[in-house]
Amino acid sequence: MGTIIESQATTVSKFAAGACFYQLGYTGIVLLLEVIAADFSNLNYRLLASFVPALPFIINTWISGNITTAVGTRWKWGIGMWAFILPLSCIPLGICLLHMRWLAHRDEETKKQLDQVENEWKIPRSWNQFWDVYVMDLFIWKLDFIGLFLSCVTFGCILVPFTLAGGLQRQWRTAHIIVPEVIGWVIALPLYIIWETKFARMPLTPWDLIKDRGILFALIIAFFINFIWYMQGDYMYTVLVVSVNETIKSATRITSLYSFVSVITGTILGVFIIKFRRTKPFIMFGASMWFLSFGLLVHFRGDTNSHSGIIGSLCLLGFGAGFFTYTTQASIQASAKTHEKLAVITALYLATYNIGSALGGAISGAIWTQVLPREISKRLKNETLSADAYGSPFTFIYQYPWGSPERVSVTQAYKHVQKILCIVGLCFCVPLLLCTFMLRNYRLADSVTLDEDEKEHGNYTTDGKYAEDDGYDSDTATMKQRFVRMFQ
C-alpha cells in the first residue's frame, strides 16, 4: 500500500504518507524474518541464519545500477513496481509456513496447543468483549500503543526540524522549527519516560533486561552502526555523481558495495562461528576496521582521483560491518538467555537500529543543509547559480560539464561538506569501539537459547555472570580480576 501511495503522490504530504505505510510494512517484514531466523536456528548457527535474508544483496549490487538506469525519470514506475514484486517474493515463505502449520496440526499435542491459542484470540461476538480483549488488552497494554505513539512524537518533533531548517540561519528562529523542538524535548520525552516507567504494563523498553551490560552495550552499538553509516552514506550517491563525475549506473553500484562486501564477509564468518562459537573478538575487530575506513573516506571525498579510493573505503567499511553488525545481534540474542525474551530483545535491537538511522539521517541532513549552500555560494559568488547548484545538482551538472570553472567550484564545496560528515562519523567510531569491549562473550550453544543449554550443561549462572568452571569465582575475585573479566 505504501509504494502505491508513493507512486501516485502529487504532493510531498501524500508521498510522506505513503512512506510511513511503507516503513511500517518494511520494519514488520524485517522483524518477522529475524524472529523466524532466531526461532529456527541454534545459537551457533544464528549468525549464518540471520544473513540468509540479506543474501540477495550479492546480486542487487550488480543489477541495481541497470534497473536505475532503465527506470530513468519514470520515478512512479520505479516505485510502484515493488507493489507486486514484494508480495510475489513472499509466496515461497508463505507456502513454507503454511506447510509447517499443516504438519503441526497432524501432531496431536501440537494441535492442542494451537487450538488453545486460537481460542484465546477468537474474535468475540459482543462489542464489550471485543473492546476488552482487542482494544484494551492487546492494543493498549500488550502492544503499548500509547508508548509507541509518544516515542514517535518524541523522535519526530526532535529530529525533523534539523533538516527542515535548511541552510538559512534565520529559519531556526521561526515558530515551525522552535515549536516541534519544544514539544519533543519538554512535553513528549518526559511523558514517554513517565508512561514507560510508571504505567505501562508491558513497556516498549524492558528495563529489567537493559540492566545487563551484554544487552545495554549491544543496543548502543546497534544505535551507532546506522548513525555512523549515515554520516558518510546518506549523500554518497550525490557526491559520486556531482563531485566524482560518476555515471548513474556506476554511482548506484559503488554505493551498494558496502552491502555486497558485508553480506559475503558475514556469511563466511557465520560458517566459521558454527565451530568457533564466540562473537566478541570479531565484533571488536570489525568496529576497529571502521576507523581505517572512515580515515580513508576523509581523504578520498571528491574529484576523479578519488574513484578508486572511495571504492576501497566502502569495501573496507563493508568488510568491517560483516564482522560486527549481525554478530552483535547474535550476541544480544545470546544475552537474552530465555526463549520468551528472544523476540522482545530482537525487536528492541532493531528498534534501536532504526533510531540510529533516524538520528543519523537528521544530523547528516542538518550538516548538509547548513554547510553546503554556504560553501557553494562562497565559491560561485552568484546567488542564482548557487541556488540552482544546490537545489538541482543533477540538472546543474548537465549544464556545466566536468572541468568547467563552475563545476570545479561546486566539486570543492561538496568535498568540504563530505569531509565534515566523515570526520563526524570517525569521531563516533571511538564510543562504538569502546562499547564492543563491554559486551559479553558467551559460548554459543547447540540450542535456541542459553537457558535451554544451561538446563543440560550449566554453561552460565542464573545471575548473568559467566560460568565459573574456568577458575573464576565472582564471590572471591579481586578488583583486577573483575576488571579484566569485564572485557572478556
Predicted segments, located by residue:
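Symmetry-related core transmembrane helices of the 12-TM Major Facilitator Superfamily/SLC fold
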Residues: 78-95, 148-154, 180-188, 383, ...
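Transmembrane-helix exit segments and adjacent C-terminal regions of multi-pass membrane proteins
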Residues: 98, 395-488
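Membrane-helix boundary/linker segments in multi-pass transporters
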Residues: 156-251
